[in-house]
UniProtKB/Swiss-Prot annotation:
Keywords for this protein: ATP-binding, Cytoplasm, Glycolysis, Kinase, Nucleotide-binding, Transferase
Taxonomic lineage from the root: Bacteria, Pseudomonadati, Pseudomonadota, Gammaproteobacteria, Enterobacterales
GO terms, biological process: glycolytic process
Signal sequence segment: none
Name used for this protein in its record: Glucokinase
Entry's EC annotation: 2.7.1.2
Gene assigned in the entry: glk
Kinase among keywords: yes
Length: 321
């Protein structure tokens, strides 16, 4: 008889839940709920389990916020809870709450070739560190290493490192944004809101007044090629994405590959392919040759957060991935 576990991927707006076959890792019965419609994450879990008439003992839910102890307070939502209390209330034997990019990193060993698009470099080196990052509402970062037949995710808040400009144009962006918001992290330019910041800074650098545009507006105008400011912003976004990925590669020697997740890049895939992304990735001066062969992959799997939550839980329960 198939034994299932609950897996989840929770962001600031939606909670996506599914079942994971503990033996195979297969994800099924995925459903998305609006976080605004429920008073707590526990309430969403109860609704899901009732709707699917399934009893589970184990669960792993990825959440887009730092996980530093038993108490979890979501960054972009009012939900806050004790992991131990939620586990007890649900009657689970095992419940893990992990960072969303911990889950994405743990999905990488489970991905197939059709889930990936490669951008330059050669073949990944088995046993070497892996980096994963992705722009969405924010900028998530994690690393992954393989030790003693186990995959170990190294989460953190790498999206909040300093934005490090490496051209006159990027330095201008930093100067304008710093005057507005003070500390300028990488996330301030590599995210949905970050794309807006890039557009606004480009327009303001020419002593003009920027329009009140959303990330979607900027992307659409850039792709339609009817707004030079939007096209510059999107082009710069791609280059800075490359620079940041190259920084991750240098920091950990990620010859196992650098992976891009998140919902933004797939929206302008053809533009991204033709952009200065790979040039930015390899623009490392004396260490250009060091990163030249490191492959970069875009993850195009529909639910890497759910897949990775399942992988994390299965490994915790003793399965070898």
């Amino acid at each position: 008889m198939t034994k299932y576990a609950l897996v989840g991927d929770v962001g600031g707006t939606n909670a996506r839940l599914a079942l994971c076959d503990i033996a195979s890792g297969e994800i099924s019965q995925a459903k998305t709920y609006s976080g605004l419609d429920y008073p707590s994450l526990e309430a969403v879990v109860r609704v899901y389990l009732d709707e699917h008439s399934v009893s589970v003992e184990d669960g792993c839910i990825a959440i887009a916020c730092p996980i530093t102890g038993d108490w979890v307070a979501m960054t972009n939502h009012t939900w806050a809870f004790s992991i131990a209390e939620m586990k007890k209330n649900l009657g689970f034997s095992h419940l893990e709450i992990i960072n969303d990019f911990t889950a994405v990193s743990m999905a990488i060993p489970m991905l197939k070739k059709e889930h990936l698009i490669q951008f330059g470099g050669g073949e990944p080196v088995d046993g070497k560190p892996i980096a994963v990052y992705g722009a969405g509402t924010g900028l998530g970062v994690a690393h992954l290493v393989h030790v003693d037949k186990r995959w170990i995710s190294l989460p953190g808040e790498g999206g909040h490192v300093d934005f490090a400009p490496n051209s006159e144009e990027e330095a201008m962006i930093l100067e304008i944004l710093r005057a507005e918001i003070g500390h300028v992290s990488a996330e301030r330019v590599l995210s949905g809101p970050g794309l807006v910041n890039l557009y606004r800074a480009i327009v303001k650098s020419d002593n003009r007044l920027p329009e009140n545009l959303r990330p979607k507006d900027i992307t659409e105008r850039a792709l339609a090629d009817n707004c030079i400011d939007c096209r510059r912003a999107l082009s710069l976004f791609c280059v800075i994405m490359g620079r940041f990925g190259g920084d991750l590669a240098l920091t950990m020697g990620t010859f196992g590959g650098v992976y891009i997740a998140g919902g933004i890049v797939p929206r302008f895939l053809e533009f991204f392919k033709a952009s200065g992304f790979r040039g930015g990735f390899e623009d490392k001066g004396r260490f250009k040759d060091y990163v030249h062969g490191i492959p970069v992959y875009l993850i195009v799997h529909d639910n890497p957060g759910l897949l990775g939550s399942g992988a994390h839980l299965r490994q915790t329960l003793g399965h070898i991935l």
